[in-house]
A protein has these predicted regions:
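Conserved alpha/beta cores of soluble small-molecule-handling proteins
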Residues: 1-144
Length: 144
């Protein structure tokens, strides 16, 4: 199944949007100049606590740190972005998942200077089973 043709929702600029309707324009500044930030986040199902997002706060801190380096003004605070992660997992009914938070610049202007551009933020999540054998997850693994 293509990534643009899926059921579910994506958190897009503060709202849950149907997956197929989460769109951006081809003249978006980030598409042309590569000025955007993202993280790759995993969620795992646990017997004790259900689905847990691995090191969510650390990922969010890094996303905001990267945006700061690129002088992107994040339109949401860290707590809102953390809740967006939890919401897309919950709303999509995911147990084992990959999450992709992404901040990118809009299409208000074009050129090398990224001034006066709106920062958009999305959080998408999709089913992604663990690479680890379920038995190994229960008993643990040895790392040398």
């Amino acid at each position: 199944m293509n990534f643009d043709d899926r059921d579910g929702v994506i958190w897009f600029d503060g709202k849950m949007v149907p997956w197929r309707e989460a769109r951006t324009h081809v003249m978006t500044h980030t598409l042309h100049y590569g000025l955007g930030v993202f993280e790759g986040v995993r969620a795992y199902h646990t017997a004790e606590r259900g689905t847990c997002i691995f090191r969510l706060q650390e990922h969010t801190n890094r996303l905001f740190g990267s945006a700061h380096i690129l002088r992107m003004d994040m339109p949401f605070d860290k707590d809102t972005i953390n809740e967006a992660h939890r919401a897309v997992v919950r709303e999509n009914g995911l147990k084992e998942a990959y999450l992709r938070p992404l901040a990118y610049l809009g299409s208000e202007a074009m050129g090398l200077r990224a001034e006066g551009l709106k920062t958009h933020v999305v959080v998408a999540a999709w089913e992604w089973p663990s690479y680890m054998d379920p038995e190994a997850r229960e008993r643990g693994i040895k790392v040398r």
